[in-house]
């Protein structure tokens, strides 16, 4: 995997991060995906922990986990180990010095599908990648 090629990133102007996040979750659900969890990391590292050097400061950091049970079943049927990449995730965050910008990123499902050399897994990953990219495109409107 190549981080610069396989992680898809976009940035969006926003005055209200919480509203952006709500709209983002709605876009995921509109494509027949179920939100399984939203991890609210936010400013947890502002607490000095065990000598960890803080190099990235952020206002908000959300890890959105989601799945479509049919797609999950198809992926697992292609290779039982593909489940280590599930559920799929978006990260939505706002860095401390950019209060009017929301950033979104995800690991392109095609990247993990290439690890398995499975045509059926690649087909499902392509559909998932397209849906995730469509969510990003819709947020730009």
For each predicted feature, which ranges?
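Well-ordered alpha/beta subsegment
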Residues: 105, 112-141
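Short, internal acidic amphipathic alpha-helical interface segments
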Residues: 63-99
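Ser/Thr-rich, low-complexity intrinsically disordered terminal regions
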Residues: 26-78
